[in-house]
Design a protein with these regions (language model features):
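C-terminal accessory region of radical SAM enzymes
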Residues: 141-197, 220-277
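Short, small/polar residue-rich loop motifs at catalytic or cofactor-binding pockets
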Residues: 205-210
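Radical SAM/AdoMet-radical enzyme domain recognition
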Residues: 1-142
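Donor nucleotide-activated moiety binding/catalytic core segment of transferases
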Residues: 200
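Short, acidic, Ser/Thr-enriched surface-loop or helix-capping motifs
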Residues: 215-216
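Short cysteine/histidine-rich metal-coordination sites, predominantly Zn2+-binding motifs
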Residues: 282-286
Length: 286
C-alpha cells in the first residue's frame, strides 16, 4: 500500500476497503497515510471505507477491534474514514448499526450541526451466481421506511448510495418527511433533490454506468461488482486507461445490460426507465 502511494501523482485518489480486522502494523500504516505526513502533504486524496457488520455476522471480539480501528483513524483525521453498510434484509438490525456508528462520532466530539455520511449498498444480485443473498425489490419501500425513521432519530446522519437510488425506497414516505429526502446522496456525491420537484426535473437515479471501473488483480475490467461475469476488457488492451477507453467499455456494458428485460415489480413501475433502472440492471437477469 505504501509503495502504491509512493508511485501516485498529486491530486489523485486512493481508497481502501476493509472489514476493520487488521494487525497493529497495518493500522499504523493507515494512520500514517491519513495523517498530515502521509497523503495530505502529497496532495493525494486517501480514504478508508470500513464495512460495519451486524453482530450476527461477527464475533464480539472482532466487533470491538473494528470499533478500535475506526476510532483510531477518525481520531487522526475526521475525514479519513467512512462507514459502509450492506442492506441485505428488512430484518437486519439496521438501527443498532447506525446507533453504534453515531456513538463513535459523538464520542470523538462531532460538532453540533455537522453531518456524517454512511455509505449504504443494497445487496444486488450477482449475475451468473446462485445462492447470493439479495435484497428483494419488493422490500425496498420497507427498507426506505427504516432509513427514514433513522434519519429522524439521528439528525447528523446522511445516507450515501455510490450507485443508484431506487425511488421506490420512498414509496412509504409521509408529506411531513419530505425534507428528509435531501439527506440521501446518490451516484456518490449528488444530494437527492426535493421530492416535490421530481416530476418537473430531469432526474435520473438509476445505474451510474459511468462510475469508476472495477479492475481485478489480473487487470481484467468490469463495470461493477454485480456484473463480474461480464469482462469488458483488460487494461493491457489499452496503452492507457483514458476517457476514450473507459467510454468504450461502458458502451459494451450497456449493450449487455439491456439484453434482459425488467421483471416485476419494476416492469409495471412508473419510475422504471424514467428516473430508475430497476435499482440495478442485475435484477433483470434473475
Amino acid at each position: 500500500l505504501s509503495k502504491t502511494l509512493d508511485n501516485m501523482q498529486p491530486f489523485t485518489f486512493l481508497g481502501v476497503f476493509t472489514n476493520g480486522l487488521m494487525s497493529d502494523q497495518a493500522l499504523d500504516l493507515l494512520l500514517d497515510l491519513v495523517g498530515r505526513g502521509g497523503s495530505i502533504e502529497r496532495q493525494i486524496q486517501f480514504s478508508v471505507l470500513l464495512n460495519w457488520q451486524t453482530m450476527e455476522n461477527i464475533s464480539e471480539k472482532n466487533h470491538a477491534r473494528c470499533k478500535e480501528v475506526a476510532e483510531a483513524i477518525l481520531g487522526k483525521n475526521g475525514y479519513g474514514l467512512m462507514f459502509s453498510l450492506n442492506l441485505y434484509s428488512i430484518k437486519q438490525d439496521l438501527a443498532t448499526q447506525i446507533w453504534e456508528i453515531d456513538e463513535i462520532y459523538q464520542g470523538l466530539g462531532l460538532p453540533p450541526g455537522q453531518t456524517y455520511k454512511v455509505r449504504v449498498s443494497p445487496a444486488f444480485p450477482i449475475v451468473g451466481e446462485e445462492g447470493h443473498i439479495t435484497l428483494p425489490i419488493k422490500d425496498y419501500p420497507k427498507m426506505g421506511r427504516m432509513m427514514l425513521d433513522l434519519l429522524k432519530d439521528f439528525p447528523q446522519l446522511r445516507f450515501r448510495f455510490d450507485c443508484s437510488f431506487p425511488p421506490c425506497l420512498m414509496d412509504d414516505i409521509k408529506e411531513e418527511e419530505y425534507p428528509l429526502v435531501e439527506r440521501f446522496i446518490y451516484h456518490g456525491s449528488q444530494s437527492v433533490p426535493d421530492i416535490t420537484e421530481w416530476k418537473n426535473k430531469d432526474v435520473y437515479f438509476g445505474c451510474a454506468d459511468d462510475s469508476p471501473m472495477d479492475i481485478d488483480p489480473k487487470g481484467d475490467c468490469f463495470n461493477c461488482f454485480p456484473f463480474h461475469d461480464k469482462k469488458l476488457g483488460n487494461i493491457q488492451d489499452f496503452k492507457q486507461v483514458n476517457e476514450l477507453s473507459i467510454k468504450k467499455m461502458h458502451t459494451k456494458f450497456l449493450s449487455h445490460a439491456f439484453e434482459a428485460s425488467p421483471n416485476e415489480p419494476c416492469k409495471s413501475c412508473p419510475h422504471y426507465m424514467v428516473t430508475c433502472s430497476s435499482g440495478c440492471f442485475a435484477y433483470n437477469f434473475k
